[in-house]
């Protein structure tokens, strides 16, 4: 059941493609995935040559789903997993990471029950930044000197707001790839209607009864 709760999404697929295209970055590196979900990205990083990997999720079900996947793939000996709230998780304390991956909940919606998903699914608060802001604010303490973070970043988050936030800690972001994906009805129905209206025609598209939303894969490095 836990594995179904965290089924990989189009956002996962975009990060997976990034890992595959940039596999030269992974060998010998210490990798962190913040918000592991199904564990697919963490397992893929190890398969592509990461020396070791750490995974964090606030949901214990995600930690257990990831552990099961790593055991299945014969990778668990090179990984450490922990339940926790972003950077407060015990498993990341005292560490820095060469490569950090993250696909955090980032839609402008609150924690509500959705069929087939936990209440935390996609819930980024009124502006979508409830998790993104503390993640980005703490990133500089855990990213190694020559390290790189790669994250999904949808249109609701506003790229300039992210640049300003990480710029305070001498970091910068660039768009590595852009994707447009269907916006399913269960996600659409839980979104802040004012935010949805604001971005309609500006990263959100409606064609008949179909909705689509744009997101980027961002690379974050030291400036």
Segments the model singles out, each with a brief description of its role:
Residues 7, 40, 60-61, 130, ...:
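Short alpha-helical
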């Amino acid at each position: 059941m836990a594995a179904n709760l965290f089924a990989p999404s189009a956002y996962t697929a975009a990060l997976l493609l990034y890992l595959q295209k940039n596999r030269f970055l992974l060998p010998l590196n210490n990798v962190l995935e913040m918000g592991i979900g199904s564990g697919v990205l963490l397992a893929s990083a190890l398969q592509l040559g990461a020396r070791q990997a750490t995974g964090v999720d606030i949901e214990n079900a995600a930690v257990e789903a990831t552990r099961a996947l790593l055991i299945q793939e014969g990778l668990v000996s090179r990984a450490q997993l922990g339940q926790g709230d972003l950077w407060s998780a015990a498993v990341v304390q005292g560490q820095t990471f060469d490569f950090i991956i993250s696909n955090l909940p980032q839609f402008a919606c609150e924690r509500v029950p959705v069929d087939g998903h936990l209440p935390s699914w996609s819930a980024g608060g009124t502006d979508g930044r409830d998790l993104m802001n503390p993640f980005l604010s703490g990133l500089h303490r855990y990213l190694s000197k020559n390290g790189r973070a790669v994250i999904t970043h949808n249109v609701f988050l506003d790229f300039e707001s992210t640049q300003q936030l990480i710029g305070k800690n001498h970091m910068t972001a660039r768009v590595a790839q852009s994707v447009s994906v269907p916006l399913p009805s269960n996600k659409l129905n839980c979104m802040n209607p004012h935010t949805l209206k604001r971005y309609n025609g500006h990263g959100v598209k409606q064609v008949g009864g179909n909705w689509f939303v744009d997101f980027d894969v961002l690379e974050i490095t030291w400036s």
